[in-house]
Amino acid sequence: MTKAAAIYQFWSGFDLTAYEENTVPTDAVFPYITYQLVTESFDNEAPVTASLWYRSESWTDINAKTEEISQKISRGGKIIPCDGGVIWLKRGQPFAQSMGDESDNLVKRKYLNITAEFMTAD
């Protein structure tokens, strides 16, 4: 599986539709995840961001999903296999930040900071 496919598979594993940043269709239905696709070569780290997008009066569901993702990555990180090796995902600092949307006060966003270490042949 390519690096891009492995990263997509990871973000798609949370029962939400996952979109690479800037590819969200105009008719996308909340909630969903957007993620930054960054790839590197052997023994290089790269900062990666993702966002959870919900439309709700409450932060309860988005906070629960943020915690689910945090637990999946865990304190020691999450290793995902890909062609030529693995990608080691780790929680960044700060891991999650709450954001709103100026155009719609019901839109809730959690901005996630991740570090991806690429242990791959290329």
Label every PLM stretch briefly.
Residues 1-22, 27, 34-122:
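Charged, amphipathic alpha-helical segments and their flanking helix caps
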